[in-house]
Amino acid sequence: MASVEDPGLYVLDYVPNASAQAIDEVGEQFFRIIRDAHPEVPVVFIEDVIFPHTIFDNKILEEVTKKNIAQKRLFKKLKKSGEKRIYYIFAEGMIGDDGEATVDAIHFTDLGAMRYVDHVLPVIKRALRCH
């Protein structure tokens, strides 16, 4: 990602495929590689989706919550260190809670994809305007 020439924006939406431990251990290092290569490029951090079925599965809810807390902790640490042009997108309200946003409780339907875009696009637009 850091080798991309003239990027306009980085969107870090890795939380669904990472563990809280991995975010804590290598999240900042990953960010620094990108930031060192492109110090002026905005970076958007996105939380993992809280899927509606998690009200029935405390184990998954706990795992997703831990990962999102780790992501937020990383973001706050970067902000506190003086990082500029970083943005954060919370999971709350991302895809709705009616169960219609996924085909299998994980993968988005067209409606889920639309809701996701509607949720993240305003932050991406703001990041690009400020760049």
Model-predicted regions and their roles:
Residues 38-43:
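A short helix->loop->beta-strand "cap" motif at the edges of active sites that frequently abuts
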Residues 13-22, 58-65, 103-111:
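The substrate-binding groove and active-site-proximal loops of carbohydrate-active enzymes
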Residues 51-89:
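Substrate-gating cap/lid alpha-helix
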Residues 1-37, 48-54, 100:
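Oxyanion-hole/transition-state-stabilizing segment in secreted/luminal serine hydrolases
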Residues 93-103:
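Short helix/strand-capping connector loops at secondary-structure junctions
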Residues 104-131:
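Histidine-centered active-site loop/cap adjacent to the catalytic His
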Residues 25-29, 33, 70, 115, ...:
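Extracytoplasmic/secreted proteins, especially bacterial periplasmic and envelope-associated proteins
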